[in-house]
Design a protein with these regions (language model features):
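Conserved ABC ATPase "signature" region
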Residues: 101, 105, 113-131
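Catalytic Walker B motif of ABC-type/P-loop ATPase nucleotide-binding domains
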Residues: 160-164
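A short, flexible loop at the N-terminus of ABC-type nucleotide-binding domains that lies
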Residues: 1-4, 10-23, 71-73
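ABC transporter nucleotide-binding domain
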Residues: 176-263
């Protein structure tokens, strides 16, 4: 169990002060937990605090009974933590197995036999056994992400934190990566931080939305979808003029009879032929951001 209480983080420079997190309160249990929000919402700051890399300005984090406020607590948490940041620096001239072995040494796995077994185990888990001796510099972006997950798993963590893991991946690698995370979540807590709504929809049963450093939604993906009930429509137009009148265009589909728009907004009076449709997670997210006064530019 992770308990985050009244957590705030302020960055101060000579020219300005930035409140990255503002009184965040969350409880996170076992399984996949999704943290969704736009770029700049404070997600990475929160992940770095949980990983013990950044100290909060205020508040407390307790993970499995250990507080990040104390040196002993931070040490205990790091021993059971795996972390994949947005940008993981890798030694490109090393092979995958050499890099994971190096990371295992840094994580305190001193027993050579145990380390060899763990390296083989995690490379197999992420589907890289056949490429274990290849140099990382020859890997695709998706393969490098899987190396990143492997190094995060090498100490068999109870808590795995992954920050924007699918950004920049092609559709096939994104699906592969999501499936990998779901398979790993049976035995541990995984926090998936992302701005990609589909990643949450396909992996998580519990989630929160962060915006401007504050939690603006906490619940299930189904609960977020319900937020948009009565505010999502489908409208087909033979005109190239894009629907407006305070509506957000979530998607456009070109059909023989015209362009089919999926719209989110408070009123559809200007388009009497529009039909109400069942919200998806992206619709719920767009409606939530609109209702909180946040700018949403989907298309």
């Amino acid at each position: 169990m992770i308990t985050i209480s009244s957590l705030s983080k302020i960055y101060r420079t000579k020219n300005r002060t930035v409140q990255a997190l503002d009184n965040v309160n969350l409880e996170i249990g076992t399984g996949m937990f999704g943290l969704l929000g736009p770029n700049g919402a404070g997600k990475t700051t929160l992940m770095r605090i949980l990983a013990g890399i950044v100290n909060p300005s205020q508040g407390e984090v307790i993970i499995n009974g250990h507080s990040l406020k104390t040196g002993a607590g931070k040490k205990a948490i790091k021993a059971t933590l795996g972390y994949l940041p947005q940008e993981l620096g890798m030694y490109q001239e090393l092979s995958a197995s050499q890099f994971i072995d190096y990371m295992a040494i840094l994580k305190g796995i001193d027993d050579t036999q145990k380390r060899v077994q763990q390296v083989e185990k995690v490379l197999n888990m992420v589907g890289l056994s056949q490429d274990a001796e290849r140099k990382i510099k020859g890997f695709s972006g998706g393969m490098k992400r899987r190396v990143g997950i492997a190094q995060a798993l090498v100490n068999d963590p109870e808590l795995l934190i992954v920050d924007e893991p699918t950004a920049g991946l092609d559709p096939e690698e994104r699906i592969r990566f999501r499936n990998l995370l779901v398979n790993l979540s049976d035995e541990r807590t995984i926090i998936l931080s992302t701005h990609i709504v589909e990643d949450i929809a396909q992996t998580c049963q519990d989630m929160a939305v962060l915006s401007s450093g504050q939690v603006i939604f906490r619940g299930s993906p189904a609960g977020l979808m319900r937020e948009a009930d009565g505010h999502v429509w489908s409208f087909t137009s033979d005109s190239m003029e894009r629907p407006d009148h305070g509506l957000t265009v979530v998607s456009m589909l070109h059909l023989p009879e015209g362009i089919q728009y999926r719209l989110v907004g408070s009123s559809i009076e200007k388009y009497p032929t529009a039909e109400a449709v069942k919200p998806g997670l992206e619709d719920g997210y767009v409606w939530l951001m609109r209702s909180k006064g946040q700018t949403v530019d989907v298309l």
